[in-house]
Amino acid sequence: MTTSFYFLLMALGLLLYVCQSSFGNQHTRTFDTPKHRCGSEITNSYMDLCYRKRNDAGKKRGRASPLWQRRGSLSQLKARAKRNGAFHLPRDGRGVVEHCCHRPCSNAEFKKYCS
C-alpha cells in the first residue's frame, strides 16, 4: 500500500465525517419539537409537563409524589381533568385532542392546557 492510498482513505473518511455531521442533524428532535400526541401519550405528556414543576421539590428530597406513583391510573387523571376542566378549556374552539393529536403541537402549546 502506498502513501497516496492512505492519504486518499483519510481524505475520504474526513469527507464522510464532514457530510454526516453537517447533514445528519436536520432530523433530530429537540425538547420542544412539535409532535403528535394521541391516546395515552396525551395523558403521559399532561403528567410530565403539567405536574413536573409541582413535584420537583419532592423529587429532590427523594420522594415521588402520590400523583406520579398513580401515573398509570387513567381514570383518576380523567376525573381530575374533568373536575379542573383541563381538557375542556376552549383554545380557539379546539380541545387538546384536536390541537395536539390531529396536528402536531409543541410542549409550550401543550402547557396551555394545564390547569
Swiss-Prot record:
Note: Venom insulins constitute about 1/25 of the total venom of C.geographus.
Primary residence: secreted
SMART domains per record: IlGF
InterPro entries attached to this UniProt entry: Insulin-like (IPR016179), Insulin-like_sf (IPR036438), Insulin_CS (IPR022353), Insulin_family (IPR022352)
Disulphide bond pairs: 38-101, 50-114, 100-105
UniProt protein name: Con-Ins G1c
Keyword Ribosomal protein: no
GO molecular function terms listed in the Swiss-Prot or TrEMBL record: hormone activity; toxin activity
Function (record text): This venom insulin, from a fish-hunting cone snail, facilitates prey capture by rapidly inducing hypoglycemic shock. It is one of the smallest known insulin found in nature and lacks the C-terminal segment of the B chain that, in human insulin, mediates engagement of the insulin receptor (INSR) and assembly of the hormone's hexameric storage form. Despite lacking this segment, it both binds and activates human insulin receptor (long isoform (HIR-B)) with only a 10-fold lower potency.
Family membership: Belongs to the insulin family.
CC annotations in GO: extracellular region
Leader sequence residues: 1-24
Record propeptide residues: 25-29, 53-94
Originating species: Conus geographus (Geography cone)
PTM sites of type 4-hydroxyproline: 34, 104
Post-translational modification: Is different from Con-Ins G1a (AC A0A0B5AC95) due to absence of amidation at Cys-114.
Keywords in alphabetical order: Carbohydrate metabolism, Cleavage on pair of basic residues, Disulfide bond, Gamma-carboxyglutamic acid, Glucose metabolism, Hormone, Hydroxylation, Secreted, Signal, Toxin
Subcellular location: Secreted
Annotated GO biological process: glucose metabolic process
Residues recorded with modification 4-carboxyglutamate: 41, 98, 109
Gene3D superfamilies attached to this UniProt entry: Insulin-like
Tissues expressed in: Expressed by the venom gland.
Pfam families the record matches: Insulin
Subunit structure: Heterodimer of A and B chains; disulfide-linked.
